[in-house]
UniProtKB/Swiss-Prot annotation:
UniProt signal peptide: none
GO biological process: tetrahydrofolate interconversion
UniProt key word Ligase: yes
Keywords from the named record: ATP-binding, Ligase, Nucleotide-binding, One-carbon metabolism
Pathway terms, separated by semicolons: One-carbon metabolism; tetrahydrofolate interconversion
This enzyme's EC code(s): 6.3.4.3
Taxonomic placement: Bacteria, Fusobacteriati, Fusobacteriota, Fusobacteriia, Fusobacteriales
Gene3D superfamilies: Domain 2, N(10)-formyltetrahydrofolate synthetase, Formyltetrahydrofolate synthetase, domain 3, P-loop containing nucleotide triphosphate hydrolases
UniProt superkingdom: Bacteria
InterPro entries reported in the protein's UniProt record: Formate_THF_ligase (IPR000559), Formate_THF_ligase_CS (IPR020628), P-loop_NTPase (IPR027417)
Pfam families listed in its UniProt record: FTHFS
TM annotation in the entry: none
Gene source species: Fusobacterium nucleatum subsp. nucleatum (strain ATCC 25586 / DSM 15643 / BCRC 10681 / CIP 101130 / JCM 8532 / KCTC 2640 / LMG 13131 / VPI 4355)
UniProt-recorded name of the protein: Formate--tetrahydrofolate ligase
Binding positions for ATP per the UniProt entry: T63, P64, A65, G66, E67, G68, K69, S70
Amino acid sequence: MTDIQIAQAAKKENIVEIAKKLGLTEDDIEQYGKYKAKVNLDVLQKNKRPNGKLILVTAITPTPAGEGKSTVTIGLTQALNKMGKLSAAAIREPSLGPVFGMKGGAAGGGYAQVVPMEDINLHFTGDMHAIGIAHNLISACIDNHINSGNALGIDVTKITWKRVVDMNDRALRNIVIGLGGKANGYPRQDSFQITVGSEIMAILCLSNSITELKEKIKNIVIGTSVTGKLIKVGDFHIEGAVAALLKDAIKPNLVQTLENTPVFIHGGPFANIAHGCNSILATKMALKLTDYVVTEAGFAADLGAEKFIDIKCRLGGLKPDCAVIVATVRALEHHGKGDLKAGLENLDKHIDNIKNKYKLPLVVAINKFITDTDEQINMIEKFCNERGAEVSLCEVWAKGGEGGIDLAEKVLKAIDNNKTEFDYFYDINLTIKEKIEKICKEIYGADGVIFAPATKKVFDVIEAEGLNKLPVCMSKTQKSISDNPALLGKPTGFKVTINDLRLAVGAGFVIAMAGDIIDMPGLPKKPSAEVIDIDENGVISGLF
């Protein structure tokens, strides 16, 4: 059966029953039909139980198809519950654009999925819509201000705030707005990005309360004035209205796995130009309600795990207790250009980063495919053992929670035996430039960093505005540990080039652009939209 057929055949429990497993009452949730709910934020204040343990699922450098982080995340939480450990997953909401583009649906796979799959992949509870409208309200107010006399003196050539839509549409990357005379606004160049790339999305995921959300929105930089002054959303006095649009979106969403175990799905920031993790609030809520929370970070350990630790955990006051590195034979052979042994060097770098840079206990999860041979599995296991890394053959795609029992046992053992004290990778008091250099040299293995001339002006602004104590959000290719997608495996002898710096002051970080990162994807020649359908009974097919 396909993933969607497996999901549709699942026996789902009413969301009230899932909430009860977490100790929640009907008054604690707002139901969106029978199988979805939002959880009220006061649950965090009312619940006094100690926090559970936080498990991060990351991966080796992925192939375009992905290596199954979400599947392993869901399978691991199913396995923990099967062992009698109260556990929940905390993951991101998929973006509509990739659903209709190349990727198709995204809610795990096989017998390690989250349901209702169709709802999660389409409109879900409306959070993406709310984030898009909130973002575009700012856009509308910027152009209205310019058309109404431009009292702030906004330099229309230096507006950095784009518009958003939750769709892959390359035709919107570069546009001209305000055509047709003065009644239609001031003509200028503009562009769209996909909604998950919005700073509003990052802010929603990094806010601990409505009050903090509003303050972060107020601090968003949308451009500069003709005199070089930073223009912020607070200058338009609209932060209250923008936050009001997000009053429901800020509440975490509760759903379930195929095995009726709880899952929080909330937020979905881009793993490149943002931090690529689900919301702080959903993670904190899961930690407060369960003994073990399994979460994931976008792309590989060089990108997602670093930002999870240095951005999400730092801003949310979170402490991970263990990391799982997902590896596949397919991806390792890809990095070795067909040679599995050579490709293991990629895994080696990620193990080193997790153990020695992030200082976390770890387990390598080999996400098993039916084409994998015993010889290949044995080679990976031997490699991990030689490096002092626990390893587990993970079969959650085929067997659900049962296929993740060994992984769950080894994760619990790693947590119980951990003697190291968690700390962030870099000192927040380093300058932005020093943080970038530390990440590039130590996490990526670069010989050095080249800063393009365009970055000098931004560094000057960072210094003048006192922004050096913000964390750094690295934006680079996910296809390589380096900034060059062609360098596979464990690259050496390279330098990272930082082409540009972007100020995400509202979210609370500075984005370092290494290479050309597209924030508005396009559809492939044959998009997934061509195979998605709905019958007369409302049954959807082709999502995955």
